């Protein structure tokens, strides 16, 4: 069995609502008959592969993917918009992903999308999603964990999640305070050159900061009934953690050594390759890595090839493809 813990879904009725918007996220019809979705920064091609779950199942079958954990794409930035604007659309998503999961219980499990600009509403929607709709947890924005102080603002969600026994997926995404003022122009790319490379570096550095917050602080200590996984192999942290260890030893940093804390959360392998996966296994352990593809934004074939080509033994490979995800979702 193969379980994809990082896959996205945009219900058809939600896509229709996004076509009526003119602030990110919004869907624009292109002259050649295609569509693109405008994000807080940049745009992506938007197609039927986001919404057509019958076609998605056929796509999965062709590649041997048995199950997907579905979430609304955090990169779209809707969950950071003002709550009166975002909450109705996010509730629509939650109802729809629950319906898809009920219709195909062996193929899909849903995560709730939450309106983070109003924490009371976010907590209420998490409870509704998990107790009434049968969702497994929620997707949370990476930027809410860039510092311990920012993470503290999400304690009400973790307290509610701990009582419910949920799974949280931390995915690249902005906080509500990072949303531009209403009516302001969409921000330009911050990169003057080599944008494709610098954007990848920027995203992975941001994920690493969030991973560091959760690994090296005591934020998790009171939430033993919550499971968490980070996107994208924890960002650049696997490459840098040995330097952190060196700094801690040579400069007398108090507390646990960084390498002793790497078992405190799981990471998925979305969008990375075989060599990156091998490094992450050496740092986190194969028991802390789950398969993730970022379908349909990134290539499922790419991730499957990375897991196949990585220099891993069969037991570790199967743990990444199936066993670790099963334990997270069944805790």
PLM regions with names:
Residues 215-260:
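Aromatic-lined glycan-binding groove of carbohydrate-active enzymes
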Residues 66-210:
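Active-site gating/metal-coordination segments in enzymes
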Residues 208-211, 248-250, 269-273:
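A general structural motif
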Residues 3-5, 68-70, 109-112, 138-140, ...:
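Hydrophobic faces of well-ordered beta-strands that scaffold small-molecule active sites
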Residues 8, 144, 173-175, 215, ...:
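Catalytic metal-binding/acid-base residues of hydrolase active sites
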Residues 1-5, 11-67, 95-103, 124-128, ...:
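Mid-to-C-terminal alpha-helical segments outside catalytic/metal-binding sites
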């Amino acid at each position: 069995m193969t379980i994809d813990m990082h896959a996205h879904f945009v219900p058809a009725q939600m896509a229709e609502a996004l076509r009526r918007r003119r602030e990110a996220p919004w869907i624009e019809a292109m002259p050649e008959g295609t569509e693109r979705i405008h994000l807080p920064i940049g745009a992506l091609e938007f197609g039927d592969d986001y919404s057509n779950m019958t076609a998605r199942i056929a796509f999965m079958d062709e590649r041997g993917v048995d199950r997907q954990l579905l979430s609304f794409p955090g990169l779209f930035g809707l969950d950071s918009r003002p709550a009166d604007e975002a909450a109705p659309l996010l509730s629509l998503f939650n109802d729809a992903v629950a319906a898809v999961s009920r219709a195909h219980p062996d193929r899909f499990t849903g995560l709730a999308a939450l309106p983070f600009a109003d924490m009371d509403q976010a907590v209420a929607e998490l409870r509704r999603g998990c107790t009434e709709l049968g969702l497994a947890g929620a997707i949370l924005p990476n930027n809410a964990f860039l510092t311990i102080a920012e993470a503290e603002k999400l304690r009400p969600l973790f307290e509610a999640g701990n009582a419910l026994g949920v799974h949280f997926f931390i995915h690249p995404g902005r906080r509500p305070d990072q949303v531009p003022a209403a009516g302001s122009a969409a921000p330009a790319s911050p990169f003057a050159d080599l944008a494709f490379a610098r954007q990848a570096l920027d995203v992975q550095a941001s994920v690493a900061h969030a991973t560091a917050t959760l690994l090296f602080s005591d934020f998790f200590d009171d939430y033993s009934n919550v499971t968490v996984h980070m996107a994208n192999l924890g960002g650049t942290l696997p490459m840098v953690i040995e330097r952190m260890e060196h700094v801690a030893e040579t400069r007398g940093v108090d507390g646990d050594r960084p390498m002793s804390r790497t078992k405190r959360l799981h990471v998925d392998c979305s969008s990375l390759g075989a060599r990156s996966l091998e490094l992450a296994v050496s740092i986190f352990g194969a028991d802390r890595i789950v398969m993730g593809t970022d379908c349909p934004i990134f290539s499922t074939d790419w991730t499957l090839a990375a897991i196949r080509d990585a220099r891993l033994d069969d037991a570790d490979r199967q743990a990444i493809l199936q066993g670790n995800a099963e334990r997270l979702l069944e805790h």
